[in-house]
């Protein structure tokens, strides 16, 4: 039986983007292990993470808590996490490591090289791209180029990343997979009416309702929508944000400073996104960078 380690910085990435791979590997009778931080840094709720762990257990997947920090600048914490990762690799003989996220990719490929384990790295959108800040190029490009040499298969999800990886990086193999797929039918029908959803959220039935779904961080750039709303006081605009993250408090304070606190609602992690989309009028997608914008 082949033993595969799925590695990422945080558990929410595995939950949101990697479950199809995990199920496929289990269907192929592989012994699957998931190593990541189940405790900190996740962009979903602790309750969702607990459910996710139960789902993994039901599939027969082994979980390992690795205390990664999401930021590459938390060197001490990530060094400790790297020691934890090496302990996992010493305990079991793995046939392959599949790593995700920049931090997971760095330490995963470093460990794979040390233990001579074949490694796959999925780049969910490089931080360097045409039009990216110079700082991104100075920091991330040399690191990704260096670790590409330690990569057996480098998976990209957009054409710009693929073309650059083929031309400039030296992974043994570079492939492009156009994302994780989309199920339009999943969002075709709501379980509640538009009116019911708005009443539950205490929103006017005649409001122009904006919605964004995703982690609340600077890259997602939700602040620009709130600032735009302040410039259109004549319109009955309301904005709901589904997600959690470090920007939540800032966004609440920004809305208050612009006298929009009653029109901007941060709902946190939601499992009724389909209903919320049907109750909304405009989907807002103001990200500065997306590996695969849909």
What function would you assign to each model-found segment?
Residues 15-23, 208-231, 246-252, 294:
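A conserved mid-protein helix/loop that constitutes part of the nucleotide-sugar donor-binding site
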Residues 49-54, 187-203:
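A short helix/loop element that forms part of the nucleotide-sugar donor recognition site in Leloir-type
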Residues 76-83, 118-120, 128-146, 150:
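Nucleotide-sugar donor phosphate/pyrophosphate-binding loop at the beta->alpha transition
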């Amino acid at each position: 039986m082949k033993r595969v380690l799925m590695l990422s910085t945080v558990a929410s990435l595995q939950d949101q983007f990697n479950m199809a791979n995990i199920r496929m590997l289990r269907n192929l009778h592989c012994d699957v292990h998931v190593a990541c931080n189940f405790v900190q840094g996740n962009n979903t709720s602790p309750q969702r993470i607990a459910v996710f762990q139960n789902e993994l257990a039901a599939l027969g997947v082994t979980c390992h808590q690795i205390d990664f920090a999401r930021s590459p600048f938390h060197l001490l914490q990530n060094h400790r996490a790297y020691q934890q990762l090496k302990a996992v690799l010493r305990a079991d003989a793995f046939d392959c490591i599949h790593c995700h996220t920049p931090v997971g990719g760095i330490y995963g490929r470093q460990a794979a090289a040390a233990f001579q384990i074949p490694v796959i790295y999925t780049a969910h959108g490089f931080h360097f791209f045409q039009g990216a800040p110079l700082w991104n190029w100075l920091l991330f490009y040399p690191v990704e180029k260096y670790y590409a040499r330690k990569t057996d298969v480098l998976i990209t999800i957009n054409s710009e990343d693929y073309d650059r990886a083929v031309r400039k990086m030296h992974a043994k193999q570079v492939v492009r997979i156009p994302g994780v797929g989309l199920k339009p039918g999943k969002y075709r029908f709501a379980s509640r009416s538009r009116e019911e959803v708005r009443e539950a959220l205490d929103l006017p039935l005649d409001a122009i309702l904006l919605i964004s779904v995703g982690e609340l961080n600077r890259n997602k750039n939700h602040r620009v929508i709130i600032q735009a709303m302040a410039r259109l006081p004549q319109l009955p605009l309301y904005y709901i944000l589904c997600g959690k993250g470090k920007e939540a408090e800032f966004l609440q304070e920004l809305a208050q400073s612009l006298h929009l606190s009653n029109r901007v609602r941060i709902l946190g992690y939601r499992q009724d996104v389909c209903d919320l989309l049907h109750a909304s009028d405009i989907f807002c997608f103001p990200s500065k960078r997306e590996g695969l914008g849909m």
